[in-house]
Regions:
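Membrane-embedded alpha-helical segments, specifically the hydrophobic cores
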Residues: 1-31
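Conserved nucleotide-binding and Mg2+-coordinating catalytic segments in signaling enzymes
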Residues: 37-56, 77-91, 99
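A short pre-motif secondary-structure segment
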Residues: 114-117
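Catalytic core regions of nucleotide second-messenger enzymes
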Residues: 146-162
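Short helix/loop segment flanking the catalytic signature motif in cyclic-nucleotide metabolism enzymes
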Residues: 97, 110, 124-141
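Catalytic-core segments of nucleotide cyclases and related cyclic-nucleotide turnover enzymes
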Residues: 136, 154, 169-216
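Residue-level recognition of strand-loop junctions within catalytic nucleotide-signaling folds
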Residues: 87, 127-130, 147, 169-170
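Short regulatory alpha-helical coupling segments
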Residues: 38, 51-71, 102-110, 128
């Protein structure tokens, strides 16, 4: 092989190496940007959507339901006696309870449903194309599945229960913040009625404090 031809192939190889290096740098940058985007949308502990993410995604989903004139619902969940679990068994066990709850929600919810951790021991779900009876059925499946969770700590079985509040677009409109308020009032009514239960926004408050919360 002649010297000019050898030099040509050597130059071509160098050019290819440079091109591959730029491609790799570009792919790494794209991967880093994707990782940062996902991290900004994800609750670090549970892997579920964080509050900011579910607020944004739920608004989009509810707008689509409104435009198509179909019902939707929002569920607000709060783990019962979670502070007692943390105080009695430690925050590591509390973290495990939150993780197990997220896994349970992921397994129970339907394709197209959204859920995320919105703070502390609270999770929110947005259910598109869902009537009030269907929302109640989903909420009850969630409550039942979580009631079957059992974590062990030093030979002690830790049982977990959850209270769930439901708000439907048929009664509360399509604004996510308003739906969350209605679901929050229903959730506190579930707490007032003994916990480990599901209530919707039609529940009549049993105590003045809950009546005031619903009216505010």
């Amino acid at each position: 092989m002649s010297q000019p031809l050898i030099a040509f192939f050597a130059l071509e190889a160098i050019v290819q190496l440079i091109a591959m290096s730029f491609l790799q740098i570009g792919m790494e940058k794209e991967r880093d940007e994707l990782h940062q985007k996902l991290a900004a949308q994800t609750d670090e502990l549970t892997g579920a959507a964080n509050r900011r993410s579910i607020l944004q995604r739920a608004d989009t989903l509810l707008a689509s339901c409104r435009d198509r004139h179909v019902a939707a619902a929002v569920l607000l969940l709060d783990l019962d006696h979670f502070k007692s679990i943390n105080d009695s068994f430690g925050h590591d066990i509390g973290d495990n309870v939150l993780k197990a709850t997220a896994v349970t929600l992921s397994g129970v919810l339907r394709k197209g449903d959204l859920f995320g951790r919105v703070g502390g021991e609270e999770f929110a779900c947005c259910l598109p194309n869902t009537s009030p009876p269907e929302a109640a059925a989903v909420a009850e499946r969630i409550r039942n599945a979580i009631s079957k969770l059992c974590l062990m700590y030093s030979g002690v079985a830790i049982r977990v229960t959850v209270s769930v509040g439901i708000a439907s677009t048929e009664r509360a409109g399509y604004d996510f913040q308003e739906l969350m308020k209605a679901a929050d009032a229903a959730l506190y009514e579930a707490k007032a009625r003994g916990r480990d239960r599901v209530e919707d926004e039609t529940a009549q408050p049993r105590h003045a404090v809950f009546r005031e919360r619903l009216a505010s």
